Amino acid sequence: MKSIVFVALFGLALLAVVCSASEDAHKELLKEVVRAMVVDKTDAVQAEERECRWYLGECSQDGDCCKHLQCHSNYEWCIWDGTFSK
């Protein structure tokens, strides 16, 4: 009878350790996924900052805007410059 109780308690302890390890692995996986999402967003923001400003994007001079756009003097955003060429 004592051995059955010992085996049952040992089994429960082993199950608790396995579940705890599984939960830790799940938390680590979740942290990695969230970290990857945050890194992707910061990379996207940096890429946008390196490129030219699109239509109605904030600017301080014409060189900030993309091709066929110019910086509006009053509102400081990129607007169409009136050209059609490629």
UniProtKB/Swiss-Prot annotation:
Kindly name one Pfam family recorded for this protein: Toxin_12
Say which domain of life the source belongs to: Eukaryota
Positions of disulphide bridges: 52-66, 59-71, 65-78
Which keywords belong to this entry?
Disulfide bond, Ion channel impairing toxin, Knottin, Secreted, Signal, Toxin
Main subcellular location? secreted
Q: Which residues form the propeptide?
A: 22-50
Q: Name one GO molecular function term.
A: toxin activity
Which family, according to the similarity comment?
Belongs to the neurotoxin 10 (Hwtx-1) family. 17 (Hntx-9) subfamily.
Query: What is the stated purpose of this protein?
Result: Ion channel inhibitor.
What is the protein name stated in its UniProt record?
Omega-theraphotoxin-Hhn1d
User: What organism, scientifically named, is this protein from?
Assistant: Cyriopagopus hainanus
